[in-house]
């Protein structure tokens, strides 16, 4: 009980609890704190789903969220979410009950060496004494809770606390009543506790030549929610001061009115972006966006690149071309920002040229993608941002949806807050994480394919239980459409489907309704506005399904890229002639 109380004092507000006997002391303590109003408790029967749900809560709130499991294979099921938390720098507390040391390595039931299951991806592994948690006094438990919290938030990521429990595990009802009658909550912590801010360290590495052209590549946001406003202010000031173009990843968490944004860079790169005769400087923020075209372009530019991470000291440069700084953009910009009076005001000539190309891309997409008729995935992504309220966040499944949003979403859609798995880029836990995000943020739209949704169908249990305002827009193309965008032979079709696309004979509408989730089927793009309005008005989890043609959409994407490249070549040819 004291351990969870001390974690709550540190700032823990939410726990996701999975069933088990060995974890009964933790379950009873969590339930008691929830009844006292000290924290929120969510229950889930699937540990993998539970961990991703906690990941969504932590990502949206910026606070570490705890998952409690019993021993054995329950711990192994936490690994996928722990991997994503590690790669995406999301604070996650993994509290696992265990058998005492005397039962290890002797064939005892449900007793495994779970201490090592999560170690490779956790910021730290902590454990109470092998004889049982009851051997720790209150001062030791307070120290354990403080250490756990600081490890999770210091360099944000998952931490694993393994807790051996000796029997008896289940106090009597009378004992529980006596305990809670005498229970005195810890004094209020005075607000959310974060680790102390590190002292600002001057950057003594190379600095861009601000008088020369450059470009900002803003990758997926990898920092604590509390640090995002400072990051946004620094990015805004940098873009205004330099006039550099900003190639923006959908997950970059950029401010709404950021100047210099180039949205359709992935479509523009094959035609070749005009660059200065001298090498173009590149400022990269966070990990690279997931684009082979961008990687090839950056590799061709060569050295003269800077990479700024938000406290992540690990190497984030697979290209091996950048000087990396882990101070965070706000601190780095404070160290190196130029005197604005020394630079010409307004957008750079490079930004002006790239904006002309982006306008051509937007015009070509508007011509090629209809606003009505049968639904294609590119057309859906192009029109959808214009139909959603500007402040409504979106989660994009880490398959075709996140790629299509990057390529085809209308350039005037604004810097909408988007979430996805771009750390390890898996489809595990897609629905469970979206439910966690919506529980914390309020209304949210999840764009997902059929396999990603089916892969995490247990997430519907969380959605129906908590009734978050989540609108799931299912793009059902009968299998893994992402594989049609990769250089994989698609003939014969039967072999491709069997080995890669793997279509499943499951009715997703019936599956959702079995979990008491309202559903609607859309037949055309014209159905979309009314269906979205209906779904958002429900203020609970709903499913909208659109069916698309996987093969036709793969061909459409290729055609759109060809047409855009030709249009850009015409524009650049006209510019050179002029």
Swiss-Prot record:
Pathway: Quinol/quinone metabolism; 1,4-dihydroxy-2-naphthoate biosynthesis; 1,4-dihydroxy-2-naphthoate from chorismate: step 2/7; Cofactor biosynthesis; phylloquinone biosynthesis. Keywords: Magnesium, Manganese, Metal-binding, Thiamine pyrophosphate, Transferase. Its EC number is 2.2.1.9. GO terms for biological process: menaquinone biosynthetic process; phylloquinone biosynthetic process. SUPFAM superfamilies: Thiamin diphosphate-binding fold (THDP-binding). GO terms for molecular function: 2-succinyl-5-enolpyruvyl-6-hydroxy-3-cyclohexene-1-carboxylic-acid synthase activity; magnesium ion binding; manganese ion binding; thiamine pyrophosphate binding. It catalyses: isochorismate + 2-oxoglutarate + H(+) = 5-enolpyruvoyl-6-hydroxy-2-succinyl-cyclohex-3-ene-1-carboxylate + CO2. Its cofactor is Mg(2+); Mn(2+); thiamine diphosphate. InterPro entries: MenaQ_synth_MenD, THDP-binding, Thiamin_PyroP_enz_TPP-bd_dom, TPP_enzyme_TPP-bd. Catalyzes the thiamine diphosphate-dependent decarboxylation of 2-oxoglutarate and the subsequent addition of the resulting succinic semialdehyde-thiamine pyrophosphate anion to isochorismate to yield 2-succinyl-5-enolpyruvyl-6-hydroxy-3-cyclohexene-1-carboxylate (SEPHCHC). Belongs to the TPP enzyme family. MenD subfamily. Homodimer. This is 2-succinyl-5-enolpyruvyl-6-hydroxy-3-cyclohexene-1-carboxylate synthase. It comes from Synechococcus sp. (strain WH7803). The lineage of its organism: Bacteria, Bacillati, Cyanobacteriota, Cyanophyceae, Synechococcales.
């Amino acid at each position: 009980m004291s351990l969870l109380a001390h974690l709550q004092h540190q700032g823990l507000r939410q726990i996701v609890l999975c069933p088990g006997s060995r974890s009964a002391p933790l379950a009873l303590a969590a339930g008691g704190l929830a009844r006292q109003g000290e924290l929120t408790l969510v229950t889930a029967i699937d540990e993998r789903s539970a961990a991703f749900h906690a990941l969504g809560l932590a990502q949206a709130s910026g606070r570490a969220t705890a998952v409690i499991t019993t021993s054995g294979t329950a711990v192994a099921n936490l690994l996928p979410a722990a991997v994503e938390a590690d790669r995406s720098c999301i604070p996650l507390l993994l509290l696992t009950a265990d058998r005492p040391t005397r039962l290890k390595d002797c064939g005892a039931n449900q007793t495994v060496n779970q201490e090592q299951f999560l170690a490779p991806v956790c910021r730290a592994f902590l454990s109470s004494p092998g004889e049982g948690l009851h051997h720790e006094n209150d001062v030791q438990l307070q120290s354990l809770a403080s250490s756990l919290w600081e490890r999770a938030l210091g360099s944000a990521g998952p931490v694993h606390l393994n807790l051996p429990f000796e029997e008896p595990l289940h106090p009597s009802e009378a004992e529980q009543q006596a305990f809670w009658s005498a229970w005195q909550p810890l004094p209020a912590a005075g607000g959310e506790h974060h680790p102390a801010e590190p002292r600002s360290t001057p950057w003594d590495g190379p600095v861009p030549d601000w008088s020369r052209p450059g470009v900002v590549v803003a990758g997926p946001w990898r920092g604590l929610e509390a640090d995002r406003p400072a990051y946004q202010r620094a990015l805004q000031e940098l873009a205004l001061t330099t006039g550099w173009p900003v190639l923006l990843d959908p997950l970059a968490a950029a401010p709404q009115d950021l100047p210099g944004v180039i949205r359709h860079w992935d479509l523009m790169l094959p035609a070749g972006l005009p660059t200065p005769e001298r090498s173009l400087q590149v400022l990269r923020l966070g990990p690279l966006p997931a684009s082979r075209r961008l990687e090839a372009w950056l590799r061709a530019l060569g050295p003269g690149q800077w990479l700024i991470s938000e406290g992540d000291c690990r190497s984030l440069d697979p290209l091996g071309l950048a000087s990396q700084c882990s101070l965070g953009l706000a601190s780095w910009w404070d160290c190196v920002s130029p005197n604005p009076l020394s630079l010409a005001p307004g957008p750079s000539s490079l930004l002006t040229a790239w904006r002309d190309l982006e306008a051509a891309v937007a015009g070509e997409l508007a011509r090629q993608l209809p606003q009505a008729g049968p639904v294609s995935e590119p057309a859906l992504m192009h029109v959808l941002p214009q139909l959603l309220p500007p402040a409504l966040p979106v989660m994009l499944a880490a398959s075709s949806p996140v790629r299509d949003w990057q390529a085809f979403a209308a350039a005037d859609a604004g810097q909408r807050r988007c979430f996805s798995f771009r750390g390890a880029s898996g489809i595990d836990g897609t629905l469970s994480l979206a439910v966690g995000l919506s529980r914390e943020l309020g209304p949210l739209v999840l764009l997902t394919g059929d396999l990603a949704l089916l892969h995490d169908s247990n997430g519907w249990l969380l959605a129906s239980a908590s009734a978050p305002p989540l609108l799931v827009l299912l793009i059902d193309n009968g299998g893994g459409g992402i594989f049609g965008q990769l250089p994989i032979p698609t003939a014969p079709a039967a072999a491709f489907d069997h080995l890669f696309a793997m279509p499943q004979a499951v009715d997703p509408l019936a599956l959702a309704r079995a979990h008491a989730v309202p559903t609607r089927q859309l037949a055309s793009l014209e159905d979309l506005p009314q269906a979205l309005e209906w779904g958002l008005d429900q203020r609970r989890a709903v499913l909208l399904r659109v069916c698309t043609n996987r093969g036709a959409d793969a061909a459409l994407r290729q055609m759109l890229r060809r047409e855009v490249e030709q249009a850009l070549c015409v524009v650049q040819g006209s510019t050179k002639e002029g």
